[in-house]
Curated annotation (Swiss-Prot):
Family: Belongs to the SHMT family.
Keyword Amino-acid biosynthesis: yes
Keywords noted in UniProt: Amino-acid biosynthesis, Cytoplasm, One-carbon metabolism, Pyridoxal phosphate, Transferase
Chain residues that bind (6S)-5,6,7,8-tetrahydrofolate: L119, G123, H124, L125, S353, P354, F355
Gene Ontology process terms (BP): glycine biosynthetic process from serine; tetrahydrofolate interconversion
Organism: Halorubrum lacusprofundi (strain ATCC 49239 / DSM 5036 / JCM 8891 / ACAM 34)
PANTHER family registered for this protein in UniProt: SERINE HYDROXYMETHYLTRANSFERASE, SERINE HYDROXYMETHYLTRANSFERASE 1
Cofactor(s) it depends on: pyridoxal 5'-phosphate
Assembly information from the UniProt record: Homodimer.
Protein name (Swiss-Prot/TrEMBL): Serine hydroxymethyltransferase
Annotated TM spans: none
Amino acid sequence: MDHEHVREVDPEVADALAGERDRQEQTLAMIASENHVSEAVLEAQGSVLTNKYAEGYPGERYYAGCEYADEVETLAIDRAKELWGADHVNVQPHSGTQANQAVYYAVLDPGDKILSLDLNHGGHLSHGHPANFTGQIYEVEQYEVDADTGYIDYEGLREAAEEFEPDIVVSGYSAYPRTVDWEEIQAAADAVDAYHLADIAHITGLVAAGVHPSPVGVADFVTGSTHKTIRAGRGGIVMCDEEFADDIDKAVFPGGQGGPLMHNIAGKAVGFKEALDPSFDEYAQNVVDNAEVLAETLQDHGFSLVSGGTDNHLVLVDLRDSHPDLPGGDAADALAAANIVLNGNTVPGETRSPFNPSGIRVGTAGVTTRGFDADVMEEVGDLIHRVVDNVDSDDVIYEVGERVVELCDEHPLYE
């Protein structure tokens, strides 16, 4: 990955690419929505398929010369069906948000009702936030997690559904560290004759590997992104029963997108094949095991965790008890200076600004891809504690940063 052709044409971009390569090699990617793809996926996404316009679907294109585009997209679809057990799969969405958009376009009219989890409680912008198109086109009501336990309040969700009578109930979250009971949410949706969209963007890989229960076959629609825990490059995916297949396909194209990004679909195909290898199941289990070790280590250092722990790839830390004067954004900045990259995050009962909230969200998918095990994760938890306890100490931040570089050198990404 020396980008020799880029350097000949545009040294400034080549320098930025080289800098980003070095940054990824020398820092811990602990933003829960980030991961590292293989060199095979990188190569597929940088292939000549970027040149090909392929509006339509395999066998039904609007342009000639799509025989290899058809082959690649069909491989991606078939592999996705095998991974998740879905009847119908659309691999063309450019992102998880656009996958959600396709579902809304397929079954909702402007002004219809969405019931979803509040963003401060772990939801997502594309589930109805006022700043997002969903909050501007549809009527939105939101449910919450239980204030005492941090778990989804399923009873409150059912009551909200009965009172609000939504057209669609959205499950699946961006900052919820516990197992989701898809059947419980489906029952709430069924009781009010609503559709159920399960957004598994964060846990696509965990679901594929069987370390988290699957909503496929339970929810009417399942969406996800392909670059978090599945390691198939940037993009989105929609899964559904055959009865909704035509509506979903039309909502993706021509409803919300034009030509698909065939180079990204090639990356999806390659990443899905990698995920079908038995070694991926071991990886996904290690992601969860590492998150559990990290959670226990942080708790031992006195940190409060939303829900008291984790069942998946992320740990959500509420700093208000242990560090009441330290906003999550400031903690994240100090950790980034020490080469530990994560993000400030809102927490249930948020009292600060979303731009500098009360929590930090820590993910283990990226560091598990490096090969970190339980012992290393315990040390990472110790390092996070050192920095958060000493955000104003340049010496501590430097020392932790040096140790992080050593850990990265011991577990390189791309050799």
